């Protein structure tokens, strides 16, 4: 079993929103590894960061991604930092991976002031700019396609991503 599509991208790129729209369009399930982690641990990611730290969260994330890649037949959205792990990048080889690319102004508008996003709690705009610069090469390395999300609706993006998927 393998996902029909794996979505990667920075916070605010639309992975969850576009992923849900894409899954609905294709008539398949939608899965988000961030939501999987929250369900497993029983608390929001922001609390995991506060209580156990980022390193612990990344360990949970690697496990969640590995499980999801092996058990999901629909659309899978990964957390924004999942591609930082070499283990995850290697696991994505052979999958259809779409990078939802977002520029800073749209990302800032979409994520707001970082509510519920632990890495954006302090100076969200500067942090988001740094995250975009740091992670963009990793997204590009794993992606089989890139879709620019700026100024477009989730439904428009779902149609574009669907057109990129193998038949």
UniProtKB/Swiss-Prot annotation:
It is found in: Cytoplasm. Pfam families: SKI. Its cofactor is Mg(2+). Its EC number is 2.7.1.71. One of its GO terms (molecular function) is magnesium ion binding. Pathway: Metabolic intermediate biosynthesis; chorismate biosynthesis; chorismate from D-erythrose 4-phosphate and phosphoenolpyruvate: step 5/7. Substrate binds at residues 34, 58, 80, 135. Its main location: cytoplasm. It comes from the Bacteria. ATP binds at residues 12-17, 117, 152. Keywords: Amino-acid biosynthesis, Aromatic amino acid biosynthesis, ATP-binding, Cytoplasm, Kinase, Magnesium, Metal-binding, Nucleotide-binding, Transferase. InterPro entries: P-loop_NTPase, Shikimate/glucono_kinase, Shikimate_kinase/TSH1, Shikimate_kinase_CS. Monomer. Catalyzes the specific phosphorylation of the 3-hydroxyl group of shikimic acid using ATP as a cosubstrate. This is Shikimate kinase. It comes from Salinispora tropica (strain ATCC BAA-916 / DSM 44818 / JCM 13857 / NBRC 105044 / CNB-440).
């Amino acid at each position: 079993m393998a996902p029909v599509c794996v979505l990667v991208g920075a916070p605010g790129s639309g992975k969850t929103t576009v992923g849900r729209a894409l899954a609905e369009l294709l008539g398949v399930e939608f899965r988000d590894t961030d939501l999987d982690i929250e369900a497993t641990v029983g608390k929001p990611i922001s609390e995991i960061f506060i209580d156990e730290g980022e390193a612990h969260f990344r360990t949970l994330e690697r496990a969640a991604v590995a499980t999801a890649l092996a058990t999901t037949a629909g659309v899978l959205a990964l957390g924004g930092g999942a591609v930082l792990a070499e283990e995850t990048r290697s696991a994505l080889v052979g999958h259809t991976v779409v990078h939802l690319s977002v520029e800073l102004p749209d990302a800032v508008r979409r994520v707001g002031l970082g509510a519920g996003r632990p890495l954006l709690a302090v100076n969200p705009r500067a942090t988001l700019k740094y995250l975009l610069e740091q992670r963009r090469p990793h997204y590009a390395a794993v992606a089989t396609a890139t879709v620019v999300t700026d100024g477009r609706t989730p439904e428009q993006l779902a149609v574009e991503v669907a057109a990129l998927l193998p038949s």
